[in-house]
């Protein structure tokens, strides 16, 4: 993007991404502390928020202390971006061979991650429930271990959900946003179970919970070992 600015030293702050769905609200301000970002949501009667559709992709970037000189010309700076939105795809597999109906199951992610400060740290927020915006039944063939020439069918329900940041809310977020301090981000295991971001699958026929797992913990289990190379 191109901007015309007077000579001086600036902190470059970027909230960017798609805007087709109007999923996020960012106020217009010249003060970075007012440039917060809020995920738009449907308000529930119990004081919680609900997201039932796929939402815009969001990125955040911050590059402090960049100088635009007195000499007229073009100054180019690259602002590194962090992706704030994540697509979660769940495959619920039936081992008995029985066909599964996607309408039988509900998938949701619950988190307190719908408000972000100017520096991309999470602000205090109500619990937000992200519902699956796509579900379908599917079948895949698989070979039997003892009979390599035999193939059996595996039935499953596939669900897709989109959530904001995959991180836990800092216990000191209220203090941090008021004082400007920045304590270390707490790890998921330091929080009580009810505060963790959770993925829950429910059987609508029986009303029972099929599974409920701390999503951040499980995401870390499958995190790749790839590191961005340092070019010299």
Annotate each PLM feature.
Residues 1-84:
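Short, low-hydrophobicity acidic/polar segments
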Residues 1-28, 101-220:
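Tryptophan-paired
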Residues 215-232:
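Extended, compositionally biased alpha-helical segments that mediate assembly or anchoring
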Residues 80-95:
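A short, Gly/Thr-enriched small/hydrophobic beta-strand-prone motif that recurs across taxa
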Residues 97-99:
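N-terminal onset of structured domains
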């Amino acid at each position: 993007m191109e901007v015309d600015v007077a000579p001086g030293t600036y902190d470059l702050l970027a909230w960017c991404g798609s805007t087709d769905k109007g999923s996020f609200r960012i106020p217009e301000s010249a003060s970075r502390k007012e440039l917060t970002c809020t995920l738009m949501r449907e308000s529930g009667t119990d004081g919680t928020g609900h997201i039932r559709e796929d939402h815009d992709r969001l990125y955040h970037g911050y590059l402090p202390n960049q100088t635009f000189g007195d000499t007229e010309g073009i100054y180019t700076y690259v602002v590194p971006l962090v992706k704030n939105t994540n697509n979660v795809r769940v495959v619920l597999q039936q081992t008995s061979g029985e066909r599964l109906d996607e309408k039988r199951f509900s998938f949701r992610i619950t988190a307190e991650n719908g408000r972000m400060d100017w520096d991309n740290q999470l602000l205090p927020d109500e619990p937000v429930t992200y519902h699956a915006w796509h579900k379908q039944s599917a079948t895949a063939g698989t070979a039997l271990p003892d009979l390599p020439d035999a193939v059996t069918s595996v039935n499953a329900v596939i669900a897709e959900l989109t959530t904001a940041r995959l991180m836990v809310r800092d216990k000191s977020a209220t203090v941090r946003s008021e004082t400007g301090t920045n304590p270390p981000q707490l790890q998921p295991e330091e929080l009580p179970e009810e505060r963790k971001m959770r993925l829950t699958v429910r059987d609508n026929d029986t009303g029972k919970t099929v599974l409920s797992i701390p999503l951040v913990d499980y995401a870390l289990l499958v995190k790749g070992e790839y590191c961005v190379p340092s070019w010299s």
